[in-house]
Structures are given as structure tokens and as C-alpha cells.
Amino acid sequence: MKRSPEDIQSEFDKEGASRSPIQIEDIVIGANAKEELLRFLQKKCWNHPVIVCDRNTYEAAGRLLADELRAGGIKASKVIIPEHEAGAAAADERTLVYTLINLAEETDVIIAAGAGTIHDITRFAAYQRGLPFISFPTAPSVDGFTSAGAPLILNGIKTTIQTKAPIALFADTNVLKEAPRSMTAAGFGDMLGKITSLADWEISRRLAGEPYSEAGAKLVKDALWQCIDHRAAIAMGTEAGIQILMEALIVSGLVMLALDHSRPASGGEHHISHWIEMEMLKAKQPPILHGAKVGCACAVLSDTYKELACHEKLAELPPHFREAIQSAYEGLPDGKTIAGWLASAGGPACFDEIGVKQDLVSDALKHAHTLRDRYTGLTIINENAALFAHHLHQ
């Protein structure tokens, strides 16, 4: 990996920025990651790992990983998370309890073999049991693999619980290349979401005094553009393309970990995604990949923010508000461009393509800003609803 945790930390140190230590001991991305994971366990003298996976990720990687570990003398066992009625595993109370009660007493480390939801379940279970956990992604689909926060569905509400980051991450490109194209496209969509999250972060700094880091913004922006520039290779699933996407997702996650907040990588587009997810959960509808929702939300929100930046009513706000809004949002790529990038990576380009109705998107534009105590363009639009909301919510 080109950007190690030490590299990330040194960028913040050069800036003199306050940061939290990144306590991830090893990150390996490559065709030999399974073997490296075995060596890591042997070095740590951990002999009773539990692999947490779902039915799909067990077949994709969990079974082979368990065989590899057992061949190396490690007594690996597994917990296969059951699907819910809607057809996929969910990080909710039922699943969390199921995982905890199925962890053997002698477990000394937990391995998350899956994508975002499996990691959220695993990190919470590891935190509750006081155990380390290792990340073994099966798809380059989200930037949360290295996160210390676990976004869970508690009482039907998306709630992030602070837990722990993985002690190590091993991403096997032979596994990642075989991931469904939709999941790779979701990872690309999660990265494209940084277009609006970085703009929202600038707004939160200038208008709400929220913490900001130039170094963090540059690291995430560089990772974003690596993905945009190599979107063809990512879409084709080449080893180089998958490596670039996975590294970008990990860099984004490490920046959040160092800053101890998610502002550089999660703005209004993520709030919209979370709102839609919760509404679909209430309706017992099948879940949609996180990155697919984020990418579509980014395209919608970028156009919304660009309209805000040139809105005739902007003149009624204080001058420093106008300047900040125009500086952050005028130069964003338009939604059509973002949709084109999403499509070129093999993903959905608009909410219609993933079955999300326009009225739900409109509701999200009106209410999603209430999900997080964070200042974004959505906050501005809805706190000044008499000026902007009716037009921009369309």
C-alpha cells in the first residue's frame, strides 16, 4: 500500500494538526493477503479466531480463509450471520445478540470476512467482548473497514457507536477481483461521495467553526481523484484498478480514524443515504448497497448545492455566508458529470435505477440533516426554508 498509517500520521504532524494515533499494526493489500493474515496470527500466538461472515461471503472467502488457517495450525471457527426477512444481514439488535452468543468462550480474535455490514457487526461484538478484530474485506465496497465507529440500526434508527478499529487489515486482491461488480461500483460511489462531503466540510469550518484539517482534505481529495482517473480499470475489475480503489477507501478511512470524526468523507450525501436506508428498513424493503445510495445522492446534492450557490435569494444572507457557500459549492461538478462517472464504473447513475422513488428523495432532502449534529449545505437550505427549500427540494 502506497499510503501507510505512518504516512497518514506524518501528513497531519507536518501540518501540526491535532490527531488521534492510528493503532492499526498491519495493512496488506495484495494477492498474498491470506498468507500474511496467517503469519500475523502466528506472530500474535492467536490460535482460536472466529470468522464472522454471511452466507455469501463465507462461500466467496470465508471457507478458503478458514481452510488456510487450519492448514497452518490455527483452530479457526465461524459465525455465519443469518439473513433478515428483507434478504440480507443487518447490523441491528437481533444480529448483534446472535453474534455475541455464538462466539466461543476460547475466542482470542475475531475476523470480519465480508463488506461493510459484517465489519460493523464484528467491530461491535469485538468491542463488547474486549477482543481484537481483523479486517478481511471481500469487496472494495465502503471506506469504513478501518473505522472505529460502528453504524448500527438501533430501535430502527441509524446510530453510530464508537467501538474500536481493527488491529490489522488484509485485503486479498484475488478475493476482491471476484466481488460482484455492483459492490465494486458501490465502493466507487462511496468515494465519489467525497465530492460533496469535502465541500460540506469546508462549509462546516467556515460557518460553524467545526474542526478542519487541510492535510486531511488533501489526502481524501487525492484518493478521490485517483479513483476518478482510473474508473475504467476499476470498472473492468483489473488488479491495478481494484488496488487503486481499495487503497483510496482505506486512505479515506484512515483519515477519519486519525481525525476522530468522519467529516472529510461523510456529508449531506451520507445523511441522505442514511435517511433512505432507515425508511426502507421501516417498510421492510430489501436493502440497497450503501455506496450505490451515496453515489446517487452525491449527484443530486451536487446540483442542489450548485443551485444554492447561484440562488437569487442568497443575497439575503449575511455576506460571509454568501462567500462561503459560493466558494464551497460553485465549482462542484454537475450532477450529469457525476452520474456519468458512476455509470462508467458500472454502477447506478440515479435513484430511479435503484428503485428509490422521488418523493423519498425529496423527504430526505428536507429531513436528513437532522440525523447528525453536523453543519452542511442541507442544514443551510432547511434552516432558511422560506428562502430556498421549496425550489431546491424539487
Curated annotation (Swiss-Prot):
Tell me how the cofactor is bound.
Binds 1 nickel ion per subunit.
The UniProt entry's GO biological process terms, in alphabetical order, are: glycerophospholipid metabolic process; phospholipid biosynthetic process
Q: What is its EC number?
A: 1.1.1.261
Question: Known CDD domains for this protein?
Answer: G1PDH
Which annotated residues bind Ni(2+)? Answer: 190, 270, 290
Query: GO molecular function terms here?
Result: glycerol-1-phosphate dehydrogenase (NAD+) activity; glycerol-1-phosphate dehydrogenase (NADP+) activity; metal ion binding
Q: Which UniProt keywords apply?
A: Cytoplasm, Lipid biosynthesis, Lipid metabolism, Metal-binding, NAD, NADP, Nickel, Oxidoreductase, Phospholipid biosynthesis, Phospholipid metabolism
UniProt cross-references to InterPro entries, sorted A to Z: G1P_dehydrogenase_bac, G1PDH, Glycerol_DH
One family name in Pfam for this protein: Fe-ADH_2
Q: Does the keyword NADP apply?
A: yes
Reaction catalysis annotation = sn-glycerol 1-phosphate + NAD(+) = dihydroxyacetone phosphate + NADH + H(+); sn-glycerol 1-phosphate + NADP(+) = dihydroxyacetone phosphate + NADPH + H(+)
Query: Lipid metabolism among the record's keywords?
Result: yes
Which cofactors go with this protein?
A: Ni(2+)
Q: What family does the entry list?
A: Belongs to the glycerol-1-phosphate dehydrogenase family.
Q: What job does this protein perform?
A: Catalyzes the NAD(P)H-dependent reduction of dihydroxyacetonephosphate (DHAP or glycerone phosphate) to glycerol 1-phosphate (G1P). The G1P thus generated is probably used for the synthesis of phosphoglycerolipids in Gram-positive bacterial species.
How is the quaternary structure described? Homodimer.
Please state what the protein is called.
Glycerol-1-phosphate dehydrogenase [NAD(P)+]
Q: Which organism is it from?
A: Bacillus velezensis (strain DSM 23117 / BGSC 10A6 / LMG 26770 / FZB42)
